[in-house]
């Protein structure tokens, strides 16, 4: 999108935020992540990056239904090293688009919060002076995608056009979320995992192939060494439903995000139980 000046961009952002009932900061963040994603789609690395995580979920269900502040991807076709990732992102940031935005790599570090997959965190800045927005991209490798990644058509926030990017298929998105919910059990401090399963199944459940989802879940648990959760899922879900801590975390989450306010913790648990009962028979 071409704007006359940064103030006009801020006005567009403010109007979109009001329309979606989310903060202007979230819209700005997602717009700048979109600017990065378009550059990836135009780069020689288009077929090496596979979109996943919150940004993909937001694209599937709508920004007003799921917001995120960063970008999660997995890569294929080259070794995941600091040097390789810096080189790739420097080249991607150098791609010029008529959107007034300049991107720069600020830093590279290892991801330490999770042992699910090895990863690197890329810190960037999106600049449209005086606007400067920090961006975070998590890049992993070795992800188990079942049966394979798909080409996803991504609708842009302001322009009436789309870009194409490789992404997780729906069943793999759900499988990873289900594995996270079950394996972390009552130690999970992220209510959005429950929300994501609930909203994805509510809006896209009809598009989900149960046999593929089961295979995806089995392969994900095998990859992560958590296979026993599939035989114990009913007991695990009982513990989760009875957890006061998880219930309080959900209540805080639903107060914070407008799109979750009419969904109860019991609703999310019921959805998860329904999915598991359907695929694990």
Which positions does each model-derived feature cover?
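Structured mid-to-C-terminal alpha-helical surface segments
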Residues: 1-49, 59-67, 71-281
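Catalytic metal-binding/acid-base residues of hydrolase active sites
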Residues: 56
